[in-house]
């Protein structure tokens, strides 16, 4: 979900040719001319299909063994509806993996900005930087469309719907490791990555996240369809 141009699907298909892959992306905003590019990739490879639809409007009766999304959940307006719909798209025993920012930690990774009290106040303070970022990346409306629910609110939704779920807390170690190994990823995270490196060298990252239980900025949610 949120397959964009299909580049990741194309890469996965090259490594796992016997597995059937399918993408879902609404292309509603027109960001980066995704729809035109994805159609070109499909035509050249003819090995997977990208459905131009949101999850909420997806009409197929087909079910899947695995649904995954990376940095998509925070763009979904209605989290309970999204969780319910994706659960219904899973085969019995299927898995839905959601990787997204955890806004219980007051940091917004798309704009590399701290969150101050709430979304509106943050925008008032950082309006210039937010508008400049959207103009530079040609993603007008990105800030407005962000859903800043954190892990606590997501967990309440899951419990209210009596859904079988777990959080993979090891993602913290993998992301911290990636900051040290992936220069492009580190650069994209800006000042937050610098603080992470300093914290790691001073050994205070474990104090913050393990002992003091300060929320980690990212979360990996695993939902199982088990009846």
Give names to the regions the model predicted.
Residues 57-62:
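Short conserved loop adjoining the S-adenosyl-L-methionine
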Residues 68:
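A conserved beta-strand element that flanks and buttresses the S-adenosyl-L-methionine
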Residues 1:
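Conserved beta-strand/loop positions that form the S-adenosyl-L-methionine
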Residues 77-85, 95-222, 226:
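S-adenosyl-L-methionine-dependent methyltransferase catalytic module, highlighting the catalytic core
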Residues 71-75:
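A short His-aromatic
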């Amino acid at each position: 979900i949120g397959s964009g141009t299909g580049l990741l699907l194309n890469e996965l298909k090259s490594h796992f040719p016997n597995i059937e892959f399918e993408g879902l992306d609404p292309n509603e905003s027109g960001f980066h001319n995704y729809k035109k590019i994805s159609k070109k990739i499909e035509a050249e490879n003819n090995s997977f299909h990208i459905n131009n639809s949101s999850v909420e409007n997806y009409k197929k009766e087909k079910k899947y063994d695995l649904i995954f999304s990376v940095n998509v959940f925070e763009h979904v307006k209605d989290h309970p509806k999204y969780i319910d719909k994706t659960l219904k798209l899973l085969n019995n025993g299927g898995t839905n993996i959601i990787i997204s920012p955890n806004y219980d930690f007051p940091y917004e990774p798309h704009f590399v900005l701290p969150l101050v009290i709430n979304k509106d106040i943050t925008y008032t303070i950082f309006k210039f930087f937010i508008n400049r970022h959207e103009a530079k990346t040609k993603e007008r409306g990105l800030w407005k469309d962000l859903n800043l629910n954190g892990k606590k609110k997501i967990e309440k939704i899951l419990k209210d719907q009596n859904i079988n779920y777990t959080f993979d807390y090891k993602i913290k170690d993998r992301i911290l490791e990636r900051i040290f190994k992936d220069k492009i990823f580190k650069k994209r995270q800006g000042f937050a990555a610098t603080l992470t490196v300093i914290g790691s060298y001073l050994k205070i990252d474990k104090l913050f996240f393990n002992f003091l239980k300060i929320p980690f900025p990212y979360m990996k949610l695993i939902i199982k369809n088990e009846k």
